[in-house]
Structure formats: structure tokens, C-alpha cells
Amino acid sequence: MRKTQPKKIPLAPDPKFNDKLVTRFVNNLMWAGKKSGAYIIFYDALDKVAKITGENGYEVWKKALGNITPGVEVRSRRIGGATFQIPAEVRTDRKISLSIKWMVKYSRDRNGRSMSDKLANEIVAASKGEGAAFKKKEDTHRMAEANKAFAHFRI
């Protein structure tokens, strides 16, 4: 294990909403260092979300992220020659990272014309408690529930 914690790189808030969470999302959305392109995709997606739902796209996106944020996950631990899946609470920072990664991943896997279309559809689905990213969260929680018997083991 490493001796010291790595330094956290300070994030600049995004230009439109002045939110660091948006910057984190855009950094995960970005391909090949093209950050301005990622911002364009993200803002287009929020505009499309606003058009679809009739609500503020930014608020719908925040709600969607909240809906796919996991509370518990399973971690592998080897005990006496057997590997157990032990349920553990997810750290706050990791919760956010996982929800962002899942939303971006399952948006890319969707069918659609452009990435902004796919992202908009995934945001709308997640805000309603549907979609692949929400299903991933549910599966993670279900896995933790199924392995509740091993919760007394330390990780």
C-alpha cells in the first residue's frame, strides 16, 4: 500500500454553471484531451434534456446523478483459501466517481445519432429511475444484499 495520499488536483468550476461537479463529469466524458468538445456535448445534452422534460436540464442531471449513486458495494476478500464478496459502504468521493463513470459508460453504449443525444436520453432515463446506469446501481445494491451474511468480515 502507498504511504501517503496522492495530492488532489484542484478543479476549476465550469464556465456556465460554475460547478466543479460538472467539470468532473466533463473530464470523464472527454476523449483524447478534447475538453472543449466534451463541454459542447454536455451542454447540448442538457439543452435536449430541458426540451424533453420541460424542466431545467441542469437540475434533471443532478437528480439523475443522485438516482444512480450507489450506497453500498461488494469488495473481494480472500479468507482461508476462499474469496468472499463482502458488502461495504462506499466512500463519498467514490460514490460520485462511480455514478459519473456509469452514466458516461452507459450513455456511450446506447443507440443514438450523437453522443449528446445518447447522454440526454440516459440522463432522462436515470432521473426517472430507469436506464442502464440505474440498473447497474440496483445490481450493485442487490449483490451487497445477497452477501449480507459476510458483512461481519473486515475489509
Where are these regions (language model features)?
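Strongly charged
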Residues: 1-32, 36-39, 43-155
